[in-house]
């Protein structure tokens, strides 16, 4: 039997710019503040898929830079509200589910937002939350804002 890993205080938060993910980020920041933890805030991006003929992509199009700006805009008010919390924004290319699961190694908690629609699991917690809850290497909290 192996001994459990010592807590790191690291809370991984998956955000996509949606109101639900921003509420989850705020919740995670409060939790980090209460526990002396830190936040790793992750936003992913992908090239849009195409079928058949694809429209030309402008040479100056930089989806990673767009995502980075969105992430910075999400993190800024949270950092202002919780200045004592270390927040590391991260951008990664790819689907969010496997990236969040991989990054959950060594984290104490993974927090994602809920879509909050319907009664079925996939509709209540969303596909990313459902995937992470099943595969993450740490506990997962799917945050659903009060309505």
Tell where the protein language model's regions lie, with residue ranges.
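Glycine-rich, Arg-bearing micro-motifs that act as flexible, cationic patches
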Residues: 109-134, 145
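Generic structural signal for helix capping and beta-alpha/helix-loop junctions
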Residues: 48-49, 99, 121
